[in-house]
Design a protein with these regions (language model features):
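N-terminal intrinsically disordered, low-complexity, charge/repeat-rich segments that act as generic
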Residues: 1-22
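Glycine-rich active-site loops that engage anionic ligands at enzyme catalytic sites
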Residues: 21-154
């Protein structure tokens, strides 16, 4: 099954991303949430990452393709249990944790274009506070517009 490209608009930045087939239940759930609008805030325990806290939300997801040390551009969903449910958006070095200790979360989405702006987004949220974020399925026009805007910046 081919998954759609996801456009992420976060603050003034845009990214194209690819869903990870090795987390099929997480991907399926995420697609039902789109378009998903929320606020990104800076993590408290994990390092260079942003998160969307979801409190006691229970998606009834298993751990799949989970990691505690995601790479920049990887987006994870922690399904809850030990700590609160959350999305984690990594822009640099991350060791995923909470006040309860180390955690692992489902890696289901990866930024594939625009990654050079990840650090700028992270630092913007760190110094200025919460920013709007929108995850949506990108149609061909949105992808073309994204790429033309990137090319114009060069």
């Amino acid at each position: 099954m081919t998954h759609p490209t996801i456009l992420i608009t976060a603050g003034p930045y845009k990214f194209l991303s690819t869903l990870f087939p090795s987390a099929p239940k997480t991907v399926s759930l995420f697609l039902t949430l789109l378009p998903y609008r929320q606020k990104l805030i800076h993590v408290r325990w994990s390092g260079e990452g942003l998160w969307i806290p979801l409190g006691e939300t229970n998606f009834n997801l298993p751990f799949e393709n989970h990691t505690a040390h995601p790479a920049p551009g990887q987006i994870l969903l922690y399904p809850g249990g030990v700590s609160e449910t959350e999305f984690l958006f990594c822009y640099g070095g991350v060791a995923f944790a909470s006040k309860m200790g180390m955690l692992a979360a489902n890696h289901f989405l990866t930024v594939t274009e625009g990654g050079e702006d990840l650090r700028a987004l992270g630092e913007l949220v760190l110094w200025e506070g919460a920013k709007d974020v929108c995850f949506e399925v990108a149609d061909e026009d949105m992808i073309r517009e994204f790429r033309q805007a990137r090319k114009a910046k060069l």
